[in-house]
Each structure stands twice: as structure tokens, then as C-alpha cells.
């Protein structure tokens, strides 16, 4: 019974030794080594145990086996304590760490005595090879592994810890070969060495994955047999196991072997994961996503289940064939998802990585976890950066903002994440939220001028929050020289804010003051950045707004020398020509600009006005047809792409709807149905368009600018039809616009114009009043209402409305003309003459469309 009990104890201790060596529990190894010495037995291998369980204890020298265990434990403890030095390839010195010296003495003694069986002698060589590497003796490490014959070692039916030793041996051999001096080696020998390095790394990766899968399987089985026992702690990867997992793909990618690097990464990600490899797989997925985004175009992509292009394979040399008997288990099945392009695969990888990274991120602010928190935040931030690139390339800014919002739980005090979220909100059109986020970014980095500058840009553009824009621009200017290149942009933002405030001001004195401040501020920006074409352009635009046409032309020519094809600059040039009454020159410039920017509707609206003045409404209606055709083309394109670009026509977010086609009405006589000779150009509109029209039941989806543009096209066509006295067709166009925005002030105003042309003055007056209620600052509405009131005999009220119009926009010459006519009817001839003279003066410098139609934005 005593012998049977001793035998059971021997088995238990031996199994515990193997388990601790596999799991890396090196502190426990010292206790087990002492236990073995007390028992006076050897720790025979599991293969011996299987073959001869009763005779293994007398064939081994206990002291030598204990030395082997102690040497490995001492070395592993030393490596764990010097992880950073090992990672940075800093050799460890025996004199600075006694454990290294003791381990080396034990191993040298074992190999010199040669009393251990071959299995343990081989293990001693593998451990000593690792020790040589950390000492910086790379040639000795390679020699020791050659002596151990690692290329011929099999992992079948071996203890788990031997698989770990073999995996580490392969990666260390590869690392040692990389670090050997190559000054005297031939080119052929260097190439062979490189191939051998890659082969070592590949084998190390395969063996490491098999080891970790088997280790977890063994641990799970052990836990299921001892349900009442405590769960074993998660396995912590050593430096060399981490290197074994990733060195193969890192080496291939560094050499430019994209195919092999991607193959390694994809195989790693397809292997059945373990707890120990979860974090590593996040890193691998991030690496593969980076390769897909930065090193592979969509034309060269191949899916995980297909083969790469032949030209890729021809460029990369053949590597050694890895003769691994066992392969790691892969995820397999009939319904596995397979990406179709590199963006799709990268997005899938990053979304998986993001879910894991945000789940495991360290949120604690405790000082002892500061380093872990820093590393986890860096990993999460890198993933979100790649997500920004991936989703940005597809224009999926809403999805990006949703992803980045999930990062806010770990973004406390992290400027980069806050700024990324803010930028994503800007891109997806959530401008007010973006400004709030940018305010927080300013608190985190108050000396960074780009943050308030971005906030000013958003406030000036989509929000029209001019007071806030003024504040943010002032913050940039307040940084002074610290703002660097952003300082001129700060003055530009402030100048544009003053200019927009002048446009919004209701008193002429306030308008003049703000225009003066805008011009002074913009000139200051030009002094700081004399070669910035954007600043010079806005100086020219500001001069045009205050009707300094000659000065504006000089500045604009200066800007055009730097940016000949800029759409806004060419647009302003055309408007300046039209203000000087050079309509043909203006039309030539607009046509040239449209050639360069065929999807710019602002240019086409100006072209319509120029053609209306120069050639009559017939030619202008042809351009309206082109605008409708362009709108429909962009709309159809948006159904296919579904890209998100707020406020842009380059990929509109509009869900597919069948049956949307646009056409202007047939220009027939309402009574006889015969075609008028004057309507030949207008009749050509329907020949290019479908018979179906945009019905009122269509749901408006996508950026509002898309639909307001369509509304303006219909209303512009209605105005042209009214000029030709084709009132039925004009009514049809207004009806189409009303189907989009029934209460729009533009629609109400045009309905009033149509009623006025028809002679329904009371109806026209009521519609003008409704339009003015919706848009109290509409000077054209005021002008038409004033004239209508005058025609109905309400002279005093007409005078008041027209005075409000000229006070609201002092450069509107038509309102001055109308006011003069009303004053003349009231017998105030002297005041009327002043109004007529002002109207003549302003008309001499009035463009076909107001200069303010050109966007003022950063």
C-alpha cells in the first residue's frame, strides 16, 4: 500500500511539473523541484510514463532533472523581470543578474555530464539557446539549436511544454539569424538566410498556435473535472510566444511580400481563438486592416477564399515549405461570410477589433493602472483612426460617428478621441453637436488653434451662428504668434463673420460699419498671408459687396493667377463683368467655369440669368433643361452609391425610389393647343426628358440642399415662362416646386408673381404678405409687395414697405426705383429724384445676381 501511495504521489508531482512548465508558473517550479529532491525520484517524461509507468523512476538522475527545472525557472523569471530590455534587444549581463549566471551554470553542467536522457538533453539545449540569445550571443544560439536538431523535432504525442519550447526555439533562431553580421556573406548566402528566417518564423507561428489551442483545451478539461475548484488564471503570453505569433507576417510585410504577409494574417485570424490570443488577434486584425487600406488598391484585391493575381505571386520568391505535421484548428463552415473588396474586409476587421478593444479598455484612473490604461487607449485610438480612414473612403460618416461615440466612455482627458468624434459629427451634418464637442477639445488643448478654427468654420457655414463664430475666430487671433499658420485663417474667419453680419443687419449704418470692419480684417489676413489665394479672393468679394468694382477686379485677378480653375473665383469674375455690363464676357467666363465644374448649380443659375438678359428667355430655358437633367443624373447616381456627403452633390444619401423623372411642361397655347413660334426652344425641353414628373408624394430624403436646388430650378423656369407670357406652363412649374416645399417663401412669392401677371392683384398682395411672414428679410418680396400696394392705391403703406426694403439692402436698385415712383405719385418730387439717382448709380454696378450668392465660408 505504501508503494502504491508513493507511486501515486510520483505521478501527481510529475503531472504538476508538466502543467506548470506549460502554463509558465515559474514560482511554483521551485517548490516542485524541492519536492522532487525530497522524494528522491526523477521527473520522467510522459512518454516514458505511457510506455513503462513502473520503471521510469530508476533510469533518471533526480539531481540533474532538478537542475534542468531550476535553470528554466531562473531564466524565465529573469526574462519576465527584464521584458523591456528583451523587447528592445538589449543584451542581459550575468554580472547584473545572478539568476542568469546560476541558470547558465546548471545547463552547462547538465550538457557536460551528459547523464540525462536525450529528451531532457534536447530540452537543456533549447533552454541554453534561449539564454545565449538574451545574452546577445546570437551565433552561439544558432549553433545550439543546430545541435539540438530543432528542424527534425516532432510535436506529436509530446508534453505541452515541449511545444512551447519548440515554438520559442524557432522564433529565437530566426531572430538570431537576423542579427548575425553579414559583411562577408555573399548575396546568395544572404538570400538563403532571409528565406531561412522566414521559414523559422512561419514554423514558430504554427507551433505556437497549436500549443495555445491545446493548452486551453487541457485547461478546460481540467476545470470541468474539478467544478468545485477555482478557475485557473488566464495564460499570459511571454515575449517569445508573442514574437512567435507575429514575426512571420511582420517579416514578410517588411520585405514587401504583401501576399505572404496577408496570407499569414488571414490564417492567424481564421484559427480558433483562445483566451491567450484574443488581444493578439486584435493587433493582427489592425495590422491586416492597415495593409488593406495603405498597401493594396481595390483593383488588386483578392478575397480570403480566392488566389491573388499572378503578377503578385511572380514578384515574391518562394519560401521554404513548412513541414508541420499538425496545423491549428480553423473556423470552418458552409456559410462563412467572405468580403468582396479591401474596404469591406478592413471594415469587418476593424469593427470586430473595436468591439473587443472597447470591451477590454482600462477605465480606472488608479495610479497603479496608469500604464495599462495608456496602452489600451493607444490601441483603441489606433483602431478608431483606421476606422475613420475606412469609413471616410466610403463616405459613411454617420456610421463613423456612431462608432466614435462608443469611444467616449474611454475618452476622458483624451484630446485625440474628442477631436475625432467632433470631426465625424461635422462630416455627418450634426453641426451643433460638433461645436459642443469642439468646445471640450478647446478645454483639453487651449493652445491648439485648429480647434477654434474648425468651430468657427462650422458656425460660419452650416449653422450660421455668427456670434459664436466671432468668438472662436477671436480665440484664434488671441493666440498671436502661437497660432502660427492658423493666424491668417483666424483673421479670415473673423472677416467673413463681419461680412455675413453685415448682410444680416437691418440698419444701413450697422451694415456700413460691419462691411468696413470686414474689409479691414480681411486686409489684415492678406498682410499675414500675401500668397493665400483664398484670402485674396475673399478680399475681392468683400470689395464687390460694397460695390468697389474696379478694386475687386484687381484683387480677383491676383487670386486667379494662383488658382485659375477655382469655381468661386470664376463665378465672381462673371458677376463683376455683368456688373460692368459686359454680359458676353460674363457668359464666356461662366461657360468656361461650367466646363471645369459641370456639377455646380450656382454657376448654372448665373448662366440662366445671363442668357435671359443677353439672349432672352428661350435660351435660358434650354439651360434649365440641362439643370434638370443634371439633377436627375446626380439623383440616380445617389441611388446606386448611397454615399454620405452632407451638402454635396458628389454622392447623395437618397434611398432608391422608382419613377422619378423630370420635365418642363409643353409650351402650347392654352386655348387652341397650337404651338407658338416663340416657344421652339422651350418645347425642346420635353424631348430630352421623360413624360413622367416628380409627384408630390415623393418623400424627400438626403441633404436638404438637394431638394432646395430642385425647387429653385422649377421656380427659375416658372419666371422664364412668365416672361414669355406662358402662364399655364409657369403654373405647372410652381406647382412642382410647391410639391416639394408648400410653405416656402420662394414658392409663395412666385405664386404672387403669377397672380399679379394674371391681374389678380388682391390675391397677389395676400401671397406677398404670406411670403414676407415666412421670410421677413426678403427684399424682393418687399419690392413686389410695395409696388402692388401702390397699384392698389395704398401709397403710404407702399412707401413704408419700400423704405424697409432699401434700409434692409441699400444696394437693391429696383427697390430704390420703386420707392422713387411711389414718392413721385405722392408729389414728393425732390425725394423721388434722389431715389431715381441712387437707383441709376446702383444699377450701373449691379450684377445679374447679387454678389452674396457666392458662399462665404472657410
Swiss-Prot record:
Transmembrane segments: none
Gene Ontology cellular component annotations, sorted alphabetically: cytoplasm; plasma membrane
Function of the molecule: Component of a complex required to localize phosphatidylinositol 4-kinase (PI4K) to the plasma membrane. The complex acts as a regulator of phosphatidylinositol 4-phosphate (PtdIns(4)P) synthesis. In the complex, plays a central role in bridging PI4KA to EFR3B and HYCC1, via direct interactions.
Keyword list, A-Z: Cell membrane, Cytoplasm, Membrane, Phosphoprotein, Repeat, TPR repeat
Source taxonomy: Eukaryota, Metazoa, Chordata, Craniata, Vertebrata
Pfam families linked to this entry: TPR_8, TTC7_N
Record-listed Phosphoserine modification sites: 52, 183, 648, 678-679, 690
Protein name (database record): Tetratricopeptide repeat protein 7A
Assembly with partners or alone: Component of a phosphatidylinositol 4-kinase (PI4K) complex, composed of PI4KA, EFR3 (EFR3A or EFR3B), TTC7 (TTC7A or TTC7B) and HYCC (HYCC1 or HYCC2). Interacts with PI4KA, interaction is direct. Interacts with EFR3 (EFR3A or EFR3B), interaction is direct. Interacts with HYCC (HYCC1 or HYCC2), interaction is direct. Association with the PI4K complex is strongly reduced by TMEM150A.
InterPro entries hit by this protein: Endocytosis_PI4K-reg_protein, TPR-like_helical_dom_sf, TPR_rpt, TTC7_N
Phosphothreonine: modified positions: 693
Cell membrane keyword on record: yes
Subcellular location: Cytoplasm; Cell membrane
Positions of TPR repeats: 122-158, 415-448, 498-532, 533-566, 567-600, 745-778, 779-812, 813-846
Main location: cytoplasm
SMART domains: TPR (SM00028)
A Gene Ontology biological process term: intracellular iron ion homeostasis
Amino acid at each position: 500500500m505504501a508503494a502504491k501511495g508513493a507511486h501515486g504521489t510520483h505521478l501527481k508531482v510529475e503531472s504538476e511539473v508538466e502543467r506548470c512548465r506549460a502554463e509558465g508558473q515559474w514560482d511554483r517550479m521551485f517548490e516542485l523541484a524541492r519536492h522532487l529532491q525530497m522524494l528522491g525520484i526523477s521527473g520522467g517524461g510522459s512518454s516514458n510514463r505511457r510506455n513503462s509507468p513502473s520503471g521510469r523512476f530508476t533510469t533518471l538522475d533526480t539531481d540533474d532533472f532538478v537542475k534542468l527545472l531550476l535553470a528554466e525557472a531562473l531564466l524565465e523569471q529573469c526574462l519576465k523581470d527584464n521584458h523591456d530590455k528583451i523587447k528592445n534587444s538589449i543584451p542581459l549581463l550575468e554580472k547584473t543578474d545572478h539568476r542568469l549566471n546560476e541558470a547558465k551554470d546548471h545547463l552547462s553542467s547538465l550538457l557536460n555530464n551528459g547523464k540525462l536522457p536525450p529528451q531532457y538533453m534536447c530540452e537543456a539545449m533549447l533552454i541554453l539557446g534561449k539564454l545565449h540569445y538574451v545574452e546577445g550571443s546570437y551565433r552561439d544560439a544558432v549553433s545550439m539549436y543546430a545541435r539540438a536538431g530543432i528542424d527534425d523535432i516532432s510535436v506529436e504525442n509530446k508534453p505541452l511544454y515541449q511545444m512551447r519550447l519548440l515554438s520559442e526555439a524557432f522564433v529565437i533562431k530566426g531572430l538570431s539569424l537576423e542579427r548575425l553580421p553579414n559583411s562577408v556573406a555573399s548575396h546568395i548566402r544572404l538570400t538563403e538566410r532571409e528565406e531561412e528566417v522566414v521559414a523559422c518564423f512561419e514554423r514558430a507561428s504554427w507551433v505556437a498556435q497549436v500549443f495555445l489551442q491545446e493548452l486551453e483545451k487541457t485547461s478546460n478539461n481540467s476545470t470541468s473535472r474539478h467544478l468545485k475548484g477555482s478557475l485557473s488564471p488566464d495564460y499570459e503570453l511571454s515575449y517569445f510566444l508573442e514574437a512567435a505569433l507575429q514575426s512571420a507576417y511582420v517579416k514578410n510585410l517588411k520585405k514587401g511580400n504583401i501576399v505572404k504577409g496577408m496570407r499569414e494574417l488571414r490564417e492567424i485570424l481564421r484559427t480558433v481563438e483562445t483566451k491567450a490570443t484574443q488581444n493578439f488577434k486584435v493587433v493582427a486584425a489592425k495590422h491586416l486592416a492597415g495593409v488593406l487600406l495603405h498597401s493594396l488598391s481595390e483593383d488588386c484585391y483578392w478575397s480570403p477564399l480566392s488566389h491573388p493575381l499572378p503578377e503578385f505571386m511572380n514578384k515574391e520568391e518562394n519560401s521554404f515549405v513548412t513541414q508541420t505535421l499538425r496545423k491549428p484548428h480553423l473556423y470552418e463552415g458552409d456559410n462563412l461570410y467572405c468580403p468582396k473588396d479591401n474596404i469591406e474586409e478592413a471594415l469587418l476587421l476593424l469593427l470586430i477589433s473595436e468591439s473587443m478593444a472597447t470591451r477590454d479598455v482600462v477605465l480606472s484612473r488608479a495610479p497603479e493602472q496608469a500604464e495599462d490604461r495608456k496602452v489600451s487607449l493607444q490601441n483603441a485610438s489606433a483602431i478608431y483612426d483606421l476606422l475613420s480612414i475606412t469609413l471616410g473612403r466610403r463616405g459613411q460618416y454617420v456610421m463613423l460617428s456612431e462608432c466614435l461615440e462608443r469611444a467616449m466612455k474611454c475618452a476622458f482627458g483624451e484630446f485625440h478621441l474628442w477631436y475625432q468624434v467632433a470631426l465625424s459629427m461635422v462630416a455627418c451634418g450634426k453641426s451643433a453637436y460638433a461645436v459642443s464637442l469642439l468646445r471640450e477639445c478647446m478645454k483639453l488643448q487651449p493652445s491648439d488653434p485648429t480647434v477654434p478654427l474648425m468651430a468657427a468654420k462650422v458656425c460660419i457655414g452650416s449653422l450660421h451662428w455668427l456670434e459664436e463664430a466671432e468668438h472662436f475666430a477671436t480665440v484664434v487671433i488671441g493666440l498671436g504668434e502661437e497660432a502660427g499658420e492658423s493666424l491668417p485663417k483666424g483673421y479670415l474667419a473673423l472677416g467673413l463673420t463681419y461680412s455675413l453680419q453685415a448682410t444680416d443687419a437691418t440698419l444701413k449704418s450697422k451694415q456700413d460699419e460691419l462691411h468696413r470692419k470686414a474689409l479691414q480684417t480681411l486686409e489684415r489676413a492678406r498682410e499675414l498671408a500675401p500668397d493665400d489665394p483664398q484670402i485674396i479672393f475673399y478680399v475681392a468679394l468683400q470689395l464687390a459687396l460694397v460695390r468697389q468694382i474696379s478694386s475687386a477686379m484687381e484683387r480677383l485677378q491676383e487670386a486667379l493667377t494662383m488658382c485659375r480653375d477655382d469655381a468661386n473665383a470664376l463665378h465672381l469674375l462673371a458677376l463683376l463683368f455683368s456688373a460692368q455690363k459686359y454680359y458676353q464676357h460674363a457668359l464666356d467666363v461662366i461657360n468656361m467655369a461650367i466646363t471645369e465644374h459641370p456639377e455646380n448649380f450656382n454657376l448654372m443659375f448665373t448662366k440662366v440669368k445671363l442668357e435671359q438678359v443677353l439672349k432672352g428667355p428661350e435660351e435660358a430655358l434650354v439651360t434649365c433643361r440641362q439643370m434638370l437633367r443634371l439633377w436627375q443624373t446626380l439623383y440616380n447616381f445617389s441611388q446606386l452609391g448611397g454615399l454620405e456627403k452632407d451638402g454635396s452633390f458628389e454622392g447623395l444619401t437618397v434611398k432608391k425610389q422608382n419613377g422619378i423623372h423630370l420635365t418642363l411642361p409643353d409650351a402650347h397655347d392654352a386655348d387652341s393647343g397650337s404651338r407658338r413660334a416663340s416657344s421652339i426652344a422651350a418645347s425642346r425641353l420635353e424631348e430630352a426628358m421623360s413624360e413622367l414628373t416628380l409627384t408630390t408624394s415623393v418623400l424627400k430624403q438626403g441633404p436638404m440642399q438637394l431638394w432646395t436646388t430642385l425647387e429653385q430650378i422649377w421656380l427659375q423656369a416658372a419666371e422664364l415662362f412668365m416672361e414669355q407670357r406662358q402662364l399655364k406652363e409657369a403654373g405647372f412649374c410652381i406647382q412642382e416646386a410647391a410639391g416639394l416645399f408648400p410653405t416656402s417663401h420662394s414658392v409663395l412669392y412666385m405664386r404672387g408673381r403669377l397672380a399679379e401677371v394674371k391681374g389678380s392683384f388682391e390675391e397677389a398682395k395676400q401671397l406677398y404678405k404670406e411670403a414676407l411672414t415666412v421670410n421677413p428679410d426678403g427684399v424682393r418680396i418687399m419690392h413686389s409687395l410695395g409696388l402692388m400696394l401702390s397699384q392698389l392705391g395704398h401709397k403710404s403703406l407702399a412707401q413704408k414697405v419700400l423704405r424697409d426694403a432699401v434700409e434692409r439692402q441699400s444696394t437693391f436698385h429696383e427697390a430704390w426705383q420703386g420707392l422713387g415712383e411711389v414718392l413721385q405719385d405722392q408729389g414728393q418730387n425732390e425725394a423721388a429724384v434722389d431715389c431715381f439717382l441712387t437707383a441709376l448709380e446702383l444699377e450701373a454696378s449691379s450684377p445679374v445676381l447679387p454678389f452674396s450668392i457666392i458662399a462665404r465660408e472657410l
